């Protein structure tokens, strides 16, 4: 005879500190530094140094799903990552771009190098450090703490634009510098603030870069208007018109002149540079007789040279129409 015993199934759900959790807090420093670059000319790359200095930091971002406070009676794990997010380009007070390059990053790891706007330097430490320390594990934005860590300086170079006017410059460069603290309930937890989030963190640090430009190059005009005049639709094709501007340089220099189109052409012209004029017409644009849209000029000493921009009309009979033609391009002056 078989005896049946009732089976009991127990279901247990445990919550609290035994559940997996992660708390991430970012503390922003707010240093204001200045660096004197001295007298420079456009062909030089003046340098400046950013230093990580311990000090008071403010919480500017957090993401927490764990306990706010540790009482010292249970263990948790922590990892820290120092961040510096620095712009690749800034503008002078008179509207000229300065392009920032990395000269020496010390022991920092440079990441996300393909970003168009910012440099990302990271320094991680205290990986999987087990701790019992009592304290706040999820400080809120606006709360403060003191950071005592010290890290290597980062040295940058500045590429000056070829047509930067002479004079004194005081350029403010805002950037992010701070500490990511990550607390977790389990060994091996890893978290890094996403780069797109790091770019939006407040840039509460400021580098004031001071220098004096004592040698540059200047075009005689900031814009040129090339007029073809009133033409018959039957005789406009292949019509040529040009304008010349002079470029003066105070110092020896190699300048690359390159065109960028602002209006899309109607036709494909192979390697020739062209802009669209509307009504089925294009302009094939040349620089000093070269129709690829770029040329290089050399100044072996201070002086003035001429640059001729030419426009040759092109249209196919099946597409051209009468009307007012208009198009544009931007001429860049680029140092090597």
UniProtKB/Swiss-Prot annotation:
Q: List the disulfide bonds.
A: 64-138, 217-249
- GO MF annotation terms: carbohydrate binding
Answer whether the UniProt record assigns the keyword Secreted to this protein: yes
Where found, per UniProt?
A: Secreted; Fimbrium
Primary place of residence?
Answer: secreted
The yes or no answer to whether the keyword Transit peptide is present is no
SUPFAM superfamilies associated with the record? Bacterial adhesins
Keywords of this entry = Disulfide bond, Fimbrium, Secreted, Signal
Q: Which GO BP annotation is one of this protein's?
A: cell adhesion
Can you list the GO cellular component terms from the UniProt entry?
extracellular region; pilus
Q: Which residues form the signal peptide?
A: 1-20
**At which positions is D-galactose bound?**
79, 124-127
Question: What's a Pfam family this protein contains?
Answer: PapG_C
Q: Which InterPro entries match?
A: Adhesion_dom_fimbrial_sf, Adhesion_dom_sf, PapG_carb-bd_N, PapG_carbohydrate-bd_sf, PapG_chaper-bd_C
The misc remark on file is: Strains of E.coli that cause infection of the human urinary tract produce pap-pili (P pili) which are hair-like appendages consisting of about 1000 helically arranged subunits of the protein PapA. These pili mediate binding to digalactoside-containing glycolipids present on the epithelial cells which line the urinary tract.
State the similarity comment.
Belongs to the adhesin PapG family.
Q: What does this protein do?
A: Tip adhesin component of type P pili that plays a critical role in kidney infection through targeted interaction with the globoseries glycolipids containing the Gal-alpha(1-4)-Gal disaccharide present on uroepithelial cells. In turn, transcriptionally regulates host gene expression in kidney cells, leading to inflammatory pathway activation and renal tissue damage. Acts thereby as key determinant of invasive uropathogenic E.coli (UPEC), which cause pyelonephritis and urinary-source bacteremia.
Q: What is this protein called?
A: Fimbrial adhesin PapGII
Organism listed in the record? Escherichia coli
The upper taxonomy is: Bacteria, Pseudomonadati, Pseudomonadota, Gammaproteobacteria, Enterobacterales
């Amino acid at each position: 005879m078989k005896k049946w015993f009732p089976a009991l199934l127990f279901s247990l759900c445990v919550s609290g500190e035994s559940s997996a959790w992660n708390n991430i807090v970012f503390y922003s420093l707010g240093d204001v530094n200045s660096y004197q670059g001295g007298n420079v000319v456009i062909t030089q790359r003046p340098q400046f140094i950013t230093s990580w200095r311990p000090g008071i930091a403010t919480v500017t971002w957090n993401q927490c799903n764990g306990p706010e406070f540790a009482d010292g009676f249970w263990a948790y794990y922590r990892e820290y990552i120092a961040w510096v997010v620095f712009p690749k380009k800034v503008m002078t007070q008179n509207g000229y771009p300065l392009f920032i390059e990395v000269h020496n990053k010390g022991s920092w790891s440079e990441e996300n190098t393909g970003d168009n706007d910012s440099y990302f330097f990271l320094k991680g430490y205290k990986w999987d450090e087990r701790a019992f320390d009592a304290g706040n594990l999820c400080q809120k934005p606006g709360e403060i703490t003191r950071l005592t860590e010290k890290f290597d300086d980062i040295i940058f170079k500045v590429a000056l634009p070829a047509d930067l006017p002479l004079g004194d410059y005081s350029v403010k460069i805002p950037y992010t510098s701070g500490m990511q603290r990550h607390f977790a309930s389990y060994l091996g937890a890893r978290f890094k603030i996403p780069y797109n989030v790091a770019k939006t963190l407040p840039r509460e640090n400021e580098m004031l870069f001071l220098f004096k430009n004592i040698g540059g190059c200047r075009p005689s005009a900031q814009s040129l208007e090339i007029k073809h005049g009133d033409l018959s639709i039957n005789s406009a094709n292949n019509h040529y018109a040009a304008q010349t501007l002079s470029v003066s340089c105070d110092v020896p220099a190699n300048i690359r002149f390159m065109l960028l189109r602002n209006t899309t052409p109607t036709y494909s012209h192979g390697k020739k540079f062209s802009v669209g004029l509307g009504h089925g017409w294009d302009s094939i644009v040349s620089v000093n007789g070269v129709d690829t849209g770029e040329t290089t000029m050399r100044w072996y000493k201070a002086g003035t040279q001429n640059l001729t921009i030419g426009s040759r009309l092109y249209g196919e009979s099946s597409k051209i129409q009468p009307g007012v033609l208009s198009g544009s391009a931007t001429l860049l002056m680029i140092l090597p």
